Swiss-Prot record:
It comes from the Bacteria. Residues 112-160 are annotated as: Disordered. This is Ribosome-binding factor A. One of its GO terms (biological process) is maturation of SSU-rRNA. Residues 141-160 have a biased composition (Acidic residues). One of several proteins that assist in the late maturation steps of the functional core of the 30S ribosomal subunit. Associates with free 30S ribosomal subunits (but not with 30S subunits that are part of 70S ribosomes or polysomes). Required for efficient processing of 16S rRNA. May interact with the 5'-terminal helix region of 16S rRNA. InterPro entries: KH_dom-like_a/b, RbfA, RbfA_dom_sf, Ribosome-bd_factorA_CS. Keywords: Cytoplasm, Ribosome biogenesis.
């Protein structure tokens, strides 16, 4: 079992090698400049590596890029083996990264929240308070109220 630092270094190396080969070494038109390697994770035994990628474009370009990565998997693995210098070259698995879609969804939700906040702000622009503007007692009011309460208590005792 390898230590975490070694697995992290190997994952970083795999990410760099795969990204460089996609830019310069692979001549597949499906793997144009719209494929980005976002992250790489290596198992503890350094035998398997998961490469996360994003594709800028529509669903057809995503499917084409996925097929292109699967066809170039052997070439990419051999390049990783040359660069890594480990006893066993990790098996590469390509997984489309869901982070951009999740971020886009969160941005849409935040936009909806901003719009609803703006509607509430517009609706409350001409509104007035149901009671007084400041419903809380002030310290000088508390003193006068407590004196009246003490006098009322004294009168209640004498009435009995």
């Amino acid at each position: 079992m390898a230590d975490n630092a070694r697995a992290k270094r190997l994952a970083d190396l795999i990410r760099e090698v795969v990204a460089q080969k996609l830019q310069r070494g692979i001549k597949d038109p499906r793997l144009g400049s719209h494929v980005t390697i976002t992250d790489t994770r290596v198992t503890g035994d350094l035998r398997e590596a998961t490469v996360f990628y994003t594709v800028y474009g529509d669903d057809e370009e995503r499917k084409a890029a996925t097929a292109g990565l699967e066809s170039a998997k052997g070439i990419l693995r051999s390049e990783v083996g040359k660069a890594a210098g480990v006893k066993f070259t990790p098996t590469l698995t390509f997984v489309m990264d869901a982070l951009p879609d999740t971020a886009r969804n969160i941005e849409d939700l935040l936009d909806k929240a901003r719009q609803s906040d703006e509607k509430v702000r517009e609706a409350s622009a001409g509104a007035t308070y149901a009671g007084e503007a400041d419903p809380y007692r002030k310290p000088d009011e508390d003193e006068t109220d407590t004196e009246g309460a003490v006098e009322a208590d004294e009168t209640d005792d004498t009435a009995k």
